[in-house]
Design a protein with these regions (language model features):
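Transmembrane-lumen/periplasm boundary regions of multi-pass, lipid-linked membrane glycan transferases
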Residues: 48-53, 68, 82, 159, ...
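Short hydrophobic alpha-helices at membrane interfaces in multi-pass membrane enzymes
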Residues: 19-22, 117-123, 155-176, 351-356
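Short acidic/glycine- and proline-prone juxtamembrane loop motifs at membrane-interface regions
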Residues: 42-43, 94, 131, 137-144, ...
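Transmembrane-helix motifs of polytopic, lipid-linked glycan transferases
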Residues: 26, 92-113, 151
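Transmembrane signal-anchor helices characteristic of membrane glycosylation enzymes that use polyprenol
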Residues: 17-42, 220-236
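Specific aromatic-rich, kink-prone transmembrane helix
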Residues: 53-57, 100, 104-107, 125, ...
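Membrane-interface transmembrane helices that cradle and orient dolichyl/undecaprenyl
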Residues: 8-11, 110-113, 152-168, 197, ...
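Membrane-proximal lumenal/periplasmic loop motifs of glycosylation machinery
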Residues: 35-43, 56-77, 81-91, 259-266, ...
Length: 545
């Protein structure tokens, strides 16, 4: 009996809350960093890496809203300076920032907003979420913005809890960092501001005595960070004040103008429910638990039985003339019986539901719809999913994590072209063979309007052996220097070139709904089928027999 008790104590010690949380952190670390350069850079990643390389080698960066804010470029250029320029180094910081979401969950726990089980499950969902993992291994601005958003939330909650200026400073740094990532961050700030202003008004939070001083200090920090980075450390002041102080030439005016145009144009448009299939494809357990959590919380906020009893009391008052004070006493007793007093946890989860719903509505409305915009929606969803966590939901979540793990493995760790919407337009693994041919040649001709990511992979002096034409040219021009490789866009190519063998490769590929719309259920379980692609024709000299 004593041995059994000792064994039980050892098991409890080994599987303590802290040890399990550290294990989850290690899992998050592993799935984000392992084989980080397994796949070629995505089209957008290659552009971001190229701009960062240009910033490092030529000191050139000017704000262009098409390519978002400066934070990514400066930190990536810094990594290239320290460790060299490569696919692996380009993805290190996104992986790090994606991993650091996990410790921030622990910060929420330390403040008492979530219990131990909720902490472990929320951390596990963030650690294994296929889309969180995929876009943490991806050189885009979104994972940086998500991290800063979460850091801002933690800093705000700590500020309300302890009232210390240092937490206001952290909140300001997080805000400045997020605003230097992407142009939709002001909308997220507005969502946060409306809730917390209302919460303070209702007495859910109390502002410290020196909050006005902290607000001024924080605003100064935010403006300083943005001014320094957006002006390229003063090299492009016109981004801030405009050319000759013309309002319509400022960076923020151009950003608003550009993204309103993109919204109206719907260049990458989609229906309002665009992101729902992504939840069904990759995040089913999180999505289902979040729906249940939302219904539970909203059901608590609006209790039908309590409403009916109050209505009966009101009718009784008009019919029988019950004194007002007696009616108030009856309603008060019913209110107490229903336990409608909001706990600290309820305020937090109420915020998460509000945050999740509004951010989902915002991204559903925005005309530009792309897979990576799902991760700002997933962040609050992972917390809503752990609301009122009982053993049934816990079992469902643990089993569901097996699904998340399998999908994470499928989308992130299979070194092949995968027929998945998450990839958007991914550079094909076929390019590895194309680049082997380029590496083996002393002279290469590229006559195609579709050629990325070649400028990234042949940056610097490596580009010297490549003669580039923006579009197809005549055969004599292509062959005048006897190139070892000729690359043409297959839709604007030649059936053959004398003296050369021709082979077609995929340049980039994407999931094609139209090629799979009649077999969606079959596709869901097999994840196969026909893909859309952009192709290139590669001509190499014929080998004499």
């Amino acid at each position: 009996m004593q041995q059994a008790a000792e064994f039980s104590q050892k098991i409890k010690y080994f599987f303590s809350f802290e040890r399990i949380f550290i294990l989850i952190f290690i899992i998050a670390l592993f799935v984000r960093f392992w084989h980080l350069d397994l796949k070629l850079l995505h089209h957008d990643e290659a552009i971001h890496a190229w701009f960062s390389y240009e910033l490092l080698t030529r000191g050139v960066w000017v704000y262009d809203p098409s390519y978002h804010g400066p934070f990514l470029y400066y930190v990536t250029a810094g990594m290239f300076s320290l460790f060299g320029d490569s696919d692996l180094i380009a993805r290190l910081l996104p992986a790090l920032f994606g991993t650091l979401l996990i410790p921030l969950v622990y910060c929420i726990y330390r403040l008492g907003y979530i219990n131990k089980n909720q902490t472990l499950l929320a951390a596990l969902l963030l650690a294994l979420s296929p889309e969180m993992v995929y876009f943490s291994r991806f050189l885009r601005h979104d994972i940086f913005m998500v991290f800063f958003t979460f850091l801002l939330l933690v800093a705000i909650l700590y500020y309300f809890e302890y009232g210390q200026t240092r937490h206001a400073i952290i909140a300001a740094i997080a805000t400045g960092g997020a605003l230097c990532c992407k142009e939709e961050m002001p909308v997220i700030l507005l969502i946060f501001a409306l809730f917390f202003i209302y919460a303070v008004y209702r007495g859910k939070f109390t502002l410290p005595h020196d909050w006005k001083y902290d607000l001024i200090l924080g605003s100064f920090i935010v403006l300083t960070i943005m001014s320094v980075l957006y002006s390229a450390f003063g090299a492009h002041i016109d981004t801030l004040v405009g050319q000759n102080f013309a309002l319509n030439t400022t960076g923020w005016y151009k950003a608003i103008e550009h993204w309103i145009a993109m919204h109206n144009q719907q260049r990458l448009g989609g229906p309002l429910y665009f992101y729902i299939p992504f939840y069904v494809l990759y995040e089913v357990p999180i999505f289902i638990l979040a729906i249940i959590g939302t219904l539970q919380l909203l059901g608590k906020e609006f209790n039908p039985s309590l409403f009916i009893r109050r209505l009966k009391n009101r009718i009784q008052y008009f019919r029988s003339g019950v004194p007002t004070d007696e009616l108030a006493a009856i309603s008060l007793q019913q209110l107490k019986n229903q336990d409608t007093v909001h706990s600290k946890s309820d305020v937090f989860f109420g915020f998460c539901v509000y945050w999740m719903i509004l951010v989902m509505i915002f991204y559903a409305f925005v005309g530009e719809k792309v897979p990576w915009l799902i991760i700002p929606q997933l962040l609050p969803m992972c917390f809503v999913a752990v609301y009122k966590l009982n053993w049934q939901k816990m079992v469902f979540a643990i089993v569901g994590c097996l699904f998340l793990a399998v999908m994470t493995w499928h989308v992130a760790f299979i070194p092949a072209d995968i027929n998945e919407p998450i990839v958007q337009v991914q550079n094909s693994e076929d390019l590895r063979e194309v680049m082997r041919l380029i590496d083996a040649s002393d002279h290469v001709v590229v006559a195609s309007k579709n050629y990325w990511p070649l400028p990234w992979y042949y940056r610097g002096e490596r580009w010297n052996k490549i003669k580039f034409y923006g579009d197809i040219v005549d055969e004599p021009t292509l062959t005048q220097d006897n190139p070892g490789v000729i690359i043409l866009y297959d839709a604007a190519s030649y059936p053959s070139i004398e003296g050369y063998d021709k082979k077609t490769f995929k340049l980039g590929y994407w999931f094609s709904y139209y090629d799979n719309e009649n077999r969606l259920i079959d596709y869901y379980f097999h994840r196969d089928g026909r893909m859309g692609s952009i192709n290139i024709d590669v001509f190499t000299p014929q080998i004499a027999s």
